[in-house]
Amino acid sequence: MISELCTFALATGATRVVLRHEGGPGGRIEAPNWHSGGFLIVNASGRLFRVPLASPALEEIPTGSVSGLNNDHGPSPDGRTLAISAKSETGGSCIYLMPVEGGEPVRVTPRTPSWWHGWSPDGARLAYAAARGGGPVGVTTCAVDGSDERPLAPGFDHADGPDYAPDGAWIWFNGERDGSADLWRVRPDGTDLERMTEGETVDWFPHPSPDGRHVLFLAYPPGTRGHPADLPVALRLMPQDGGGSREVLRLRGGQGTSNVPCWAPDGGAFAFVRYPA
């Protein structure tokens, strides 16, 4: 399986292939974050890697006693801490925090399953997808110490991918309701729920840009169930204050392409992964 770790510049429309990986050590590359220190963070075969933009190569980030990471991870707003998601001692996914350079993770969420997706702009809270009490997966937040867990936006068949707007005023997510899979946003206190897309495509993983202008999201073909890999998909942009979206890239991908926040710190570019056939 070939993985191409790429960046896309909004001003020029240029795609740069940062790293072309043909399997081997690390396996399939997935879910890039763009760190302010000039490197990307990716998952490959349940391990985390740093990829310096100036001299691209996979450099493993040690995760101590925690293994089998999934592709839901991301650095804190100050760039010092990394949120990761991995199987707990009891088997369900939970969220851990660790130094961005690597180290022994500290478990945050006492309950499982929990899959991290976003930091609040002040670094005080985490947004994640969680299933509780046998119910469907939904949008949830908690304090960084795992306390004050708050489920948001009930009433969806499935809700996932929550990510904060840069001013902290909204949490964007993808939600399935009444047979439609669209993007939504809600206030951090659970009020003012608002549908932001409505169309034939199956929309996943909204990521508001740090400059407050855009939301990047992944659009699957109509009728797609879940967020599978290796399909013809599109990356689309829409304004953060609402309105129509536009396609910026068409590629082979899906799962692993843009699961987590992937914007450059200035909002002028984003990272993604594609999987050429």
Language model regions located:
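Loop/turn-rich, solvent-exposed surfaces of beta-rich toroidal or solenoidal domains
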Residues: 179, 200-237
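Conserved beta-propeller blade repeats
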Residues: 23-41, 67-82, 111-129, 156-174, ...
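Short strand-connecting beta-turns/loops that link adjacent beta-strands
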Residues: 11-12, 36-37, 45, 53-55, ...
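Multi-bladed beta-propeller domains
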Residues: 7-28, 53-68, 98-113, 142-160, ...
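Beta-strand C-termini and the immediately following turn/loop, strongest in propeller blades
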Residues: 35-46, 83-89, 127-134, 171-178, ...
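Histidine-/acidic-rich catalytic cores in large beta-rich domains
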Residues: 1-16, 30-31, 39-49, 74, ...
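Structural motif
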Residues: 2-5, 47-49, 91-96, 135-140, ...
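Hydrophobic alpha-helical segments and helix pairs
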Residues: 83-87, 92-109, 115-116, 127
